[in-house]
Amino acid sequence: MTTLPTIIKADGSKEIFDPNRLVLSLKRSGAKDFAAEHIARTITDTVSSGTSSKEIYAHAFALLRREARPVAARYALRRALLELGPTGHPFEDFVSHLYRAEGWQVETRKVIRGKCVSHEVDFYASHTEQNEFLAAELKYHNDPGYKTDLKVALYVKSRFDDIFACDASVRSCPIDRGLLVTNTKFTSEAIAYAECSGVELLGWGYPVNNTLFMRMSRAKVYPIT
């Protein structure tokens, strides 16, 4: 039985190379089954112990670009977001840049007074022309298969409820919208709860007509890793 090589992840940790994970990653970006499997087989033949995940995905991107350029661009952007870690702060700063490019005034890691306690939100944004004020909680994951779940949505909703309940006359920073942002995806339960309870979501593939990828492309704001 062939032993799979050990590769070096972006955060410096080691793991066994899994061709199936590469196939899934390519498919999530829109690659057809045959193309994803063919690329994974080609790369598997070249990977040796000590190869970095960055080298693997750069090779995958080069091969995917030959198959379909739009899919390759989507794949490259998603990988770049995954490599912003290991902490969530670079992702918070990136999303702040995206909102600024869309015309918002943004403050990161701001403390907002609630009815019961004060809350530090990952970013606070105001749009004077639209007279809108929002606060956002960001969840960064460096695993493309990890989804932000119902538990997170419930937690975020409770924080926003406390902020909304604060009397406007004493509120240190008024908001009228609460947002949960992730660089990956949401579980179906998290989406159902958010749509019912009024929590706005923004993720790689949600909402369908205004995804994080779409907004990055329109604003021409891209992560640098």
Model-derived features: positions:
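Short, mixed charged/polar active-site loops
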Residues: 14, 118, 131-133
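Acidic-basic catalytic patches of nuclease active cores, encompassing PD-(D/E)XK
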Residues: 77-113
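Conserved catalytic cores of phosphodiester-cleaving nucleases, focusing on short active-site segments
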Residues: 99, 121-125, 132-143, 154-157
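Active-site metal-binding core of divalent-cation-utilizing nuclease and nuclease-like domains
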Residues: 103-129
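Catalytic cores of nucleic-acid endonucleases
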Residues: 138-206
